[in-house]
Amino acid sequence: MASRGGGQHQRHQQQQQQPGGYGRGGGGGRGRGRDGAPYSGGRGRGQDGSYPGGRGGGYGGGGGGGGPPYYGGGGGGGGGGGGQGRGYYDDGGDGRGYQRGMEGGGGRGGYRGDGDGGYGRGGGGYHGDGERGYGRGGGGGGGGGGGYRGDDEGRSSYGRARGGGGGGGGYHGDGEAGYGRGRGGRDYDGGRGGGGRRGGRGGGGSSYHQQPPPDLPQAPEPRLAAQYAREIDIAALRAQFKGLTTTTPGAASSQFPARPGFGAAGEECLVKVNHFFVGLKNDNFHHYDVAIAPDPVLKGLFRTIISKLVTERRHTDFGGRLPVYDGRANLYTAGELPFRSRELEVELSGSRKFKVAIRHVAPVSLQDLRMVMAGCPAGIPSQALQLLDIVLRDMVLAERNDMGYVAFGRSYFSPGLGSRELDKGIFAWKGFYQSCRVTQQGLSLNIDMSSTAFIEPGRVLNFVEKAIGRRITNAITVGYFLNNYGNELMRTLKGVKVEVTHRGNLRKKYRIAGFTEQSADVQTFTSSDGIKTVKEYFNKKYNLKLAFGYLPCLQVGSKERPNYLPMELCNIVPGQRYKNRLSPTQVSNLINITNDRPCDRESSIRQTVSSNQYNSTERADEFGIEVDSYPTTLKARVLKAPMLKYHDSGRVRVCTPEDGAWNMKDKKVVNGATIKSWACVNLCEGLDNRVVEAFCLQLVRTSKITGLDFANVSLPILKADPHNVKTDLPMRYQEACSWSRDNKIDLLLVVMTDDKNNASLYGDVKRICETEIGVLSQCCRAKQVYKERNVQYCANVALKINAKAGGRNSVFLNVEASLPVVSKSPTIIFGADVTHPGSFDESTPSIASVVASADWPEVTKYNSVVRMQASRKEIIQDLDSIVRELLNAFKRDSKMEPKQLIFYRDGVSEGQFQQVVESEIPEIEKAWKSLYAGKPRITFIVVQKRHHTRLFPNNYNDPRGMDGTGNVRPGTVVDTVICHPREFDFFLCSQAGIKGTSRPSHYHVLRDDNNFTADQLQSVTNNLCYLYTSCTRSVSIPPPVYYAHKLAFRARFYLTQVPVAGGDPGAAKFQWVLPEIKEEVKKSMFFC
């Protein structure tokens, strides 16, 4: 039940305003239970003196009640003995107050107030100082308590004081009346709204922007964004650009849907975002083309040449201008150079001379940038954003060279920011990412912390010893070295730059191409004075006696012109990123390093902005750029979790997730699958079959309790060799089938080791079961099998098995409310993803996977299609036939034809949006029209996880503004300030935090024939995240996207190379093949 303060809030929410004041809020409940609803006060029933208080109960009992701090209704202290409440803070009133008060009725009051009326319905905000505290008010009063140290005089104190009482401001406010029923007071968003921190109804006042929480370092007023906002007339800009088209050559105006409005559903809250406003005071920019001859061989030489040129010629040829350079062919200046075209000469050390030709191309137009910022249709202002990114890059690299930053794309790393070994000579360097973006508030600099793997610099032999895990001695022969370590070492070292140490200051650099097949003692080559061994050459020419001549040399030349260097004379050049796939151990260590708590990550980001000193650099002055030193603070909303329905035979039939999580206790799945016959294969060499059998019995019991029709164990546990799984597993399967009554089994349970490096074994098991045998499989980890009565793990396994076998775990209690628009008309929901091989693998194919819902209106079951396509091609090939297959499957399974289509597309960058619209959406339309009459109603949404926007709670001291991990609460959505000025996009953090800082997903609508409102699409997207079958938690992206990603990852295990006949004699040719998934498996959700 809402409190009286809550009623006030509801009226203001309809006006899209935040509740006013601290508000009066409801009192606590009488028994046990939970806190009241946020914002609306509510008569919640706390337990054991939780944050808001309860009304009674025994000593230490009753607690809770009221809403949370900020906006929620108040509530007295926790239950005390009888009527004397024992509360959370101190000095509350007697009875319902916080701690045992002094006199009067106390109760539902403010935040440690002691003004007229005290905690109770009287005055006193935070450290108020009115005369007559604690009681119920009344009397002549005196000076009322201030708000957060507010001290102006007014008519009514913070509480409900009926006497005179001085007024108090809100957060440092100074309005006429306080947070009580008085009128003034600068409160959280003004108005007479509902309760805040357990005060009265609250008077009006200014918005929250003017009263940031007092416990955080705040930006000085006015903020940089506010300064620029006052100087920019958006209406005038729109009028100016009306009818204009984009000025970017070859770019079309944005064809993506405009935002249909802003969302309003959910509880409002404040969040901080790692976006820093960028002010631009200059608009006279010019683009120059750069050509260097002879062409520098090394990539880093380009910047060295231009840097020296600028240093030498800035105040002569460049007329005092300080240009910025992209590292290849583009130079930008703030103002024109004194020439249109000129050729200049640069000489580097070693008498290396280069000619640099500079030619004026054109002024850099900012019109597209201004049009987008004004919310007008325009192309992506790519050139303007590129210019700003280059300026900001040079601010870091050129003016903070004391940090020794190494740049990769938009990320900058330095061991000075932190370095930790991952394993085997591979280190993680900490760094940061920065990128300039166009948002609703204007230009924004997105800064985030980042880490990546580097090869440890120093002696090659030291690295080799770490990599192989042993000391190098003369007991190691060249044959032993190459046979046992050669391939693994060369995967790591190939392409790595080394410098020689035997030539004094001349540290010439080379790239490793391979190892020699012979040791330095015997490896020969032809020199100017005949054939020599490497050992002889270095001994004679450099008077060096090799200590490790028994090891192979590094080959740093080509096949035509080999060049051999002893490993002991080479050092690995610092600052080289490790380019190969990390081992499972290295991945695990990297994850642990990067899993910073939200408060720590935010602190690191702010420290990065401070130490980079953007506004103090020469280039900031030159180009007229200002960067705010404080992160953006904005209003977000927390969407409610949907109510989930379970089977009526369970003790708990309806579940409301809390903080994005719930459990299966006393619940049964909505539709339990039937497992008639199954077998278990033990792939662990040291695991006794009796232990496995005990686990299987527990799994059967738990599955039955969960609602599955699961046959008892009837087959013996089968043992198989993990080193020969390709042969053993099919044999064990046939053996199990021969014992089964129907000569087939429905499920193969496979127990595997916990070795972090068993990914290949897992992949082999899935490939064999799904593309060769044709049986559903469920892998279980040995460490979980060892545990006795591991009910929770068995329950999770049962949920996966149920979904794979055709069951349904849960559904929405109210489908119409949970899936607006979708529930009105038969709808098919797609998820699609394309995964690519490793960064430096150019031959392995990419995998495209598409899943689509098979039921309506529940939307819990999915069909799937997976295809192989050309390496690194992001656009899905042959999407027409894929969609057609899934449309037919929907009709087969649901017995109805779809009327509308929602397509969630993962893995697409902003630069590929137009390509997707032009290539993939027409394929979807083509598939639809081949089956149904009329044009399809398509809503196409790109889902992005690989971005660097992070949301942080505004106040880490307020547990109501975050989940248990310190992250924003699940359901937090943002569609203002940092989002696109015109187009339909939003950030949604649908998942609860587990470890580290949660990453919100970014959704960008590229087409919307179904005319979703912002609230409808955000609600559908958030609610779908509660229907992921493999766990009882909300996930970070909608299930169809999640399944598509898992399926694409799974299919990579299927890929095989087969020889191709023909071609040159003796030349082995291979082609990649993606085996077909067996039909018995394909018709299920085997990818769960």
Curated annotation (Swiss-Prot):
SMART domains: DUF1785, PAZ, Piwi. It comes from the Eukaryota. GO terms for biological process: regulatory ncRNA-mediated gene silencing. Keywords: RNA-mediated gene silencing. Residues 20-30, 51-86, 95-127, 135-148, 161-182, 191-206 have a biased composition (Gly residues). Residues 211-220 have a biased composition (Pro residues). One of its GO terms (cellular component) is nucleus. PROSITE patterns: PAZ, PIWI. Residues 747-1056 form the Piwi domain. GO terms for molecular function: RNA binding; RNA endonuclease activity. Residues 477-574 form the PAZ domain. The keyword Ligase does not apply. It holds the Pfam family ArgoL1. Residues 1-220 are annotated as: Disordered. Belongs to the argonaute family. Ago subfamily. Probably involved in the RNA silencing pathway. May bind to short RNAs such as microRNAs (miRNAs) or short interfering RNAs (siRNAs), and represses the translation of mRNAs which are complementary to them. This is Protein argonaute 18. It comes from Oryza sativa subsp. japonica. The gene is AGO18.
